[in-house]
Amino acid sequence: DPKDRKKIQFSXPAPPSQLDPRQLEMIRRRRPTPAMLFRLXEHSSPEEEASPHQRAAGEGHHLKSKRPNPCAYTPPSLKAVQRIAESHLQSISNLGENQASEEEDELGELRELGYPREEEEEEEEDDEEEEEEEDSQ
């Protein structure tokens, strides 16, 4: 009795009565069991996938499921993410260097033309502060 209690009872729909008992047995044999599905989910070698026994046993359906689903999102690998991050950081540092050199070029040109650009900016800031103080009174 203790052994009988450990057996798992699966509820299955009653088969149509018009089928022959031999056909029912063949259908039952073709149906994958949970253990079979678990085994198929594991990565199997290509030799196993091509074996004729597997197709004869009705397990060939899993080969279709091995194809990637075009709608499913596959996240990038860790190496791909690292490459993306490195290229992003590189582009940021390149932008920073280019902007700094462009600003230096502009300042040099302005100084050559006699414009003390930095002093003008400070004066503009002072004017804005004075206007804000007048507005608040």
Swiss-Prot record:
Biased composition regions of type Polar residues, renumbered to the chain: 88-99
Post-translational changes noted in the entry: Phosphorylation of Thr-33 is required for activity. Dopamine- and cyclic AMP-regulated neuronal phosphoprotein.
One Gene Ontology CC term in the entry: cytoplasm
Protein name: Protein phosphatase 1 regulatory subunit 1B
Function: Inhibitor of protein-phosphatase 1.
Annotated segments matching region Disordered: 1-137
An annotated Gene Ontology molecular function: protein phosphatase inhibitor activity
Record family assignment: Belongs to the protein phosphatase inhibitor 1 family.
Modified residues (Phosphothreonine): 33, 74
Modified residues (Phosphoserine): 44-45, 101, 136
Compositional bias annotation for Acidic residues: 118-137
Localization (cell): Cytoplasm
Alphabetical keyword list: Cytoplasm, Phosphoprotein, Protein phosphatase inhibitor
BP-aspect Gene Ontology terms: intracellular signal transduction
Annotated Basic and acidic residues bias: 40-62, 108-117
InterPro entries found in the cross-reference section: PPP1R1A/B/C
